[in-house]
UniProtKB/Swiss-Prot annotation:
This is Phospho-N-acetylmuramoyl-pentapeptide-transferase. PROSITE patterns: MRAY_2 (PS01348). One of its GO terms (molecular function) is phospho-N-acetylmuramoyl-pentapeptide-transferase activity. The lineage of its organism: Bacteria, Bacillati, Actinomycetota, Actinomycetes, Micrococcales. The keyword Lipid biosynthesis does not apply. It is a multi-pass membrane protein. The chain crosses the membrane at residues 2-22, 55-75, 86-106, 122-142, 158-178, 196-216, 239-259, 266-286, 291-311, 348-368. Its cofactor is Mg(2+). GO terms for cellular component: plasma membrane. Belongs to the glycosyltransferase 4 family. MraY subfamily. The keyword Transmembrane helix applies. One of its GO terms (biological process) is cell division. Its main location: membrane.
């Protein structure tokens, strides 16, 4: 718990102090956001607002995680160092962040609201996701537990949903596909949510807060742990280090949100939304709660579904729209809701989804008692 408090405190400090410094740098270089012409007219006033703020979040997370382990080692040289699971998650976060950074850089350099084309972005996301998935099935600990499993999970691995039903090779291939589906869905879900001041950052704070609580619980109730109190146990590698990383991410986003809330002084850009989405997917996979992500990240799912419905309805009806505008948050803006109202109500909705996910997580354990 001491490590979690140290890590979260450092991340909050780095994000709070680092974001305004980064804003000044971006203003000097005239790195501002370009706004869609077909978006809500109220958004045109945001043109030129510094973007790529996710860079601060990523660096705050990396620095806080490294310093926390250094401090813990100085306090106790026998304390465990960085874990394979956390390093894999950081790889996924940074990799997706780099894809987003490239997208943001193209927007700024070419002075347009569109960066990488959809195919190029998916290819780059897929490449990062494939490397992550392959590595996640390796690096077993002393008990032979790898960071990820070929078994599909809700609260823990579901025995009868094993992707390796046809052998190890087929299982690995199917896992890579399954993992990439989760990664692509999560990254694009957060990316679509990042359309209003503070919306994606605030929603993500709650999501990572949930993974912090889940990681602590999985550590206490790990199979073979002397602290296990009965019921089901968890075969998750490095749950406490994942909880540390989730706490750091949540705190870093709180620090960033101070400057990103309406009226935003900086946007996270695709650099931030893709990095955060990658981290969300990483936690779902490495904590072995993939299916639970549909609840924990329910707001991201809902907003993604609104885009799918809009596009599908438009094609079927040959030009008609189901929503006034997609993603869903812009539909309510065009209905006359103030931006802050939309953001706060969507935060509430996101919080309810997170609460439902945590309820399922703990209810499953209680039932097994």
């Amino acid at each position: 718990m001491i490590a979690l408090l140290i890590g979260a405190g450092l991340a909050l400090l780095f994000a709070l102090v680092g974001t305004p410094l980064f804003i000044r740098l971006l203003v000097r270089k005239s790195y501002g956001q370009f706004i869609r012409d077909d978006g809500p007219t109220s958004h045109h006033t945001k043109r030129g607002t510094p973007t790529m703020g996710g860079t601060v979040v990523v660096f705050a997370v990396l620095l806080s995680y490294a310093l926390t382990h250094l401090i813990m080692w100085m306090m106790n040289p026998r304390s465990p160092g960085p874990s394979a699971s956390a390093l894999l998650l950081l790889f996924l976060m940074v990799g997706m962040g780099l894809v987003g950074f490239l997208d943001d850089f193209i927007k700024i350099s070419k002075q347009r609201s569109l960066g990488l084309d959809a195919k190029a972005k998916l290819v780059l996301q897929g490449a990062v996701g494939i490397i992550f998935a392959i590595l996640a099935l390796n690096f077993p600990n002393a008990d032979g537990v790898t960071p990820a499993s070929t078994q599909i999970s809700l609260v823990r691995d579901i025995p009868w949903l094993n992707l390796a039903f046809g052998g190890t090779v087929l299982g690995a291939i199917l896992f890579v596909l399954w993992s990439n589906l989760i990664v692509t869905a999560a990254t694009n879900g957060v990316n679509l949510t990042d359309g209003l001041d503070g919306l994606a950052a605030g929603a993500s704070v709650m999501v990572f807060g949930a993974y912090t609580l889940m990681g602590i619980w999985q550590s206490n109730q790990a199979c073979g742990s002397p602290r296990q109190t009965g019921g089901g146990c968890y075969s998750v590698r490095d749950p406490l280090d994942l909880a540390l990383l989730a706490a750091i991410l949540s705190a870093a986003l709180v620090g960033f949100l101070w400057w990103n809330t309406s009226p935003a002084k900086i946007f996270m850009g695709d650099t931030g939304s893709l990095a955060i989405g990658g981290a969300v997917a990483g936690f779902a996979i490495l904590s072995r709660t993939e299916l639970l992500l549909a609840f924990i990240g329910g707001l991201f799912v809902l907003i993604t579904l609104s885009v799918i419905i809009q596009v599908g309805y438009f094609k079927i009806t040959k030009g008609k729209r189901f929503f006034k505008m997609a993603p869903l948050q812009h539909h309510f803006e065009l209905k006359g809701w103030a931006e802050v109202t939309v953001v706060v109500r969507f935060w509430i909705l996101g919080g309810l989804f997170v609460a439902a996910g945590l309820g399922i997580f703990y209810a499953e354990w209680v039932v097994l008692l």
